[in-house]
Amino acid sequence: LCIDAASDWALTCVEQLPHQNHHVLIDYGAADGGTAVGLWNQVLDHLHTHQPHAHLTLIGNDLPSNDNVALAANLALQIPRPPKPTVLVSARSFYEPTTAPGTVSFGFSATAMHWLSQSPGPLPRHTHVLASGDAEALERFTAQAMQDWTAILELRSRELQVGGRLLTVNLSRDEEGRYLGHNGGKTRNVHDQLHQIWRELADEGAISEEQYRNGTVLNFYKSPEEFMAPLKDPTSAPYRHGLRLVDERTVHVSCPYRKRWNDDGNTAAFAAGLMATIRSWSRHSFASSAGDAAADAVFQRLEQRIADAPSEWSLDYVEHHQMMERVA
């Protein structure tokens, strides 16, 4: 759903690329690439329609620890279709260079760049900084997030060719302070629920106090102004390398699991599905601190909480879409 909501801007980006013999397109932080197959079908078709003689290369990027075999397989689904692109995997962090300078025509990233490159320090009384109420920690996490974002944009500005476009779809924080897991109080704050379960495990002695303190979700949902800031600062590295803001918007996407539950009333399926998607992005934070058994306990209890009060749960998305161009 998050990727689908950005498909119109992705098509606009490739439609406006300069005509040339070869284009490189890259998906940064692609995971296994499965959710983006449809988007890349559209993008490649659209670019091929506008530039039928250009050869297209599609690169999927993610960490070396990613399931890059699955990523390669999903990229390969594009090969039999016109325009029969070359497909490659770049198994590096997007906090590093991923291609040669000045080679990328269109860069895209969806729901990946909210993860921090390193810990900004302890979060002693919660598992997520935005739900913690800890002003000092918020200042540290914000500084790290902005340092990381500026570094990411500098790297992408170097990789883009002049006239190339970059489209980022990032989990965000809107003007009312809503973000993934917090929809303004319409339902429970997911991050508070995770923290309550984590605190329970510590109180029961299942994890130590040190493990409790280390169980921090190391991501940060930036505001639109924070996303745009490096592109409004002429002294920033991405700005000096020619990266400019073309357009931006905030998009809200309602929880698909909650919608399905509203329609069919299947509480067990709702609890299992919602738990699984929350687990997909938060489990590592708990397992790396206290091991697999403790992490498994978190999500067993989470699923039970959802099943006990399904009307009080919904994982609604707040996304920021940012379209950029390298002009020089």
Enumerate the predicted regions with their spans:
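A Trp-anchored, charged/polar loop motif used as the substrate-binding/catalytic surface
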Residues: L1-Q16, S90-S93, T142-L155, S223-D233
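N-terminal charged/capping segments associated with class I S-adenosyl-L-methionine
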Residues: L1-V87, A91-G102, W115-G133, T168-E176, ...
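Intrinsic disorder
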Residues: D4, A30-G38, P52, E139, ...
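A conserved beta-strand element that flanks and buttresses the S-adenosyl-L-methionine
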Residues: F108
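Short catalytic micro-motifs in class I SAM-dependent methyltransferases
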Residues: T111-A112, L231
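A short glycine-rich, Lys/Arg-flanked "PGG" loop and its adjoining helix->strand segment in the class I
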Residues: H114, P122-V162
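Substrate-binding/catalytic lobe of Class I Rossmann-like enzymes that use SAM or dcSAM, i.e.
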Residues: V162-G291
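C-terminal target-recognition/interaction regions appended to catalytic cores
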Residues: N262, T267-A328
